[in-house]
Amino acid sequence: MSLDKKTIVEAAARIADIEGISKVNLTVIAKELGIKSPSLYKHFNGGIEELNKELMLYGWHLLECEITKAAIGKAKDDAIIAICNTYRSFVLQHKGLFEAMQWYNMYQSKEHLEATKGTVAILFQVLEAYGLTEEEKVHSVRVLRGFLQGFCSIESHNGYGNPIPLDDTFNFALKTILNGISDLKK
């Protein structure tokens, strides 16, 4: 097996999704890859801190690819619904990776800012069709991000206990947000 950064990050993502992000460390990754942990320092001389950063970047890149695919050929509400459902599915399939993606400061470096820029840009692009002002688009993106990150984070930690189906709640919240966006232009 050829050992490179991508292979190591993908192994870390698998471990995070199966065991949880707290279980990701160089020893566990080395065991998963069938190597000795000092071999990982060749690729990550910053150790686990550097690996965590790469894991965050990897997760945001994957999410951007998924929501881009979901939005293609759709407009307005249909595009936003597709993006939101894809985001939610991504989180449920990649709970550990999603957790790694949350602990970043997007203004820490240009690289961090670029990591989230694509997903945000897609939302801004879709919102163009609503004829919103720049300020209204910023507010709309913030509301959508807050809803998605909050709802999906709580759901991924099994934080909802009510017997009403979560799909119904997710769709209700999304419909409420979409109605609010549409009402901006009435």
Stretches with model-predicted labels:
Residues 1-3, 185-186:
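N-terminal intrinsically disordered/low-complexity leader segments
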Residues 100, 146-163, 178-186:
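Amphipathic C-terminal alpha-helical segment
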Residues 55-82, 120-129:
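Amphipathic alpha-helical linker/stalk segments
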Residues 7, 11, 15-50, 54:
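Helix-turn-helix
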Residues 8-16, 59, 63, 87, ...:
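Short hydrophobic clusters on alpha-helical segments that form packing/core surfaces
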Residues 68-96, 134, 141-144:
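Hydrophobic alpha-helical connector segments
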Residues 106-143, 164-182:
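Amphipathic alpha-helical packing segments from all-alpha helical-bundle domains
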Residues 16, 51-59, 101, 105, ...:
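Alpha-helical DNA-contacting segments of helix-turn-helix folds
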